[in-house]
């Protein structure tokens, strides 16, 4: 079972943001920091007072929002919790993103991204894929789950734009970690991998630096060598197959 499960703080932080109403509340705080009361936020977004209060307190508990009390009123702000540096960086990234020109459907995009990080088994899968492409059985072992559960988590990671797959031969597929493009995804991935590295000094992520064609050739090399496709440490390979790799792909293999 992965050590990721021993530190659930981060996936719980993501769970607090995997909700459209909570994201809209966060955006409202960004735009009206320290000026609106809980009741004013509730009216602004068409929420019940107690629902808005619960959502704001949940984000405060995860270090995403600060709070200031004046008599009977409570005002939320973007003051950072220094004891939770990862939450502080995520808060800053999310606030910067929301101050920009948001595209249509931004709430749905962010919910899908955060849902990719809302379970410790998904973080275990991410940590495993950062070390190299993997088969479904390898991801099952990394997450400590059965096939059905692993597929369930992979669906969320795929929807989040974090994971993809490609075929290598008849009836065989490998999963890989995609290069992140969304600023929030970049921060989330870095935090997950930084936590894994802090627990294991031998951990060596090699985040997706190969295109699909190069990945297929690399998998073929591994099959020819009689080792698993994800054994990046073994650098023998066959001359004929290796010539089909681009210079960038060859460097990626040697640096792994």
Task: List the model feature ranges, each with a label.
Residues 2-66:
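DNA-contacting interfaces and partner/effector-binding or oligomerization modules
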Residues 35-37, 121, 135-137:
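Residues that mark the N-terminal boundary/hinge immediately upstream of a DNA-recognition element
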């Amino acid at each position: 079972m992965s050590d990721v499960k021993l530190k659930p703080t981060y996936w719980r932080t993501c769970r607090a943001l995997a909700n459209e109403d909570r994201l809209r509340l966060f955006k409202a705080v960004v735009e009206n920091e320290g000026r609106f009361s809980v009741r004013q936020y509730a009216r602004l977004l068409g929420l019940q007072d107690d629902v808005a209060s619960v959502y704001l307190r949940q984000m405060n508990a995860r270090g995403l929002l600060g709070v200031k009390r004046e008599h009977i009123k409570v005002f939320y702000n973007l003051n950072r919790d220094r004891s939770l540096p990862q939450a502080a960086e995520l808060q800053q990234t999310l606030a910067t993103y929301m101050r920009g020109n948001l595209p249509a459907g931004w709430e749905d995009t962010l919910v899908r991204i955060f849902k990719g990080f809302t379970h410790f088994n998904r973080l275990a899968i991410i940590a495993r894929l950062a070390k190299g492409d993997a088969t479904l059985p390898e991801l099952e072992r990394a997450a400590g789950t059965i096939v059905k559960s692993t597929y369930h988590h992979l669906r969320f990671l795929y929807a989040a734009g974090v994971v993809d797959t490609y075929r290598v031969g008849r009836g065989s597929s490998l999963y890989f970690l995609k290069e992140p493009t969304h600023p929030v995804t970049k921060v989330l991935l870095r935090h997950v991998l930084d936590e894994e590295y802090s627990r294991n000094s031998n951990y060596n992520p090699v985040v997706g630096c190969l295109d699909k064609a190069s990945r297929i050739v690399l998998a073929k090399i591994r099959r020819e060598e009689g080792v698993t496709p994800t054994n990046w440490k073994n650098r023998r390979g066959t001359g004929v197959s290796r010539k089909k790799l681009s210079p960038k792909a060859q460097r990626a293999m040697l640096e792994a």
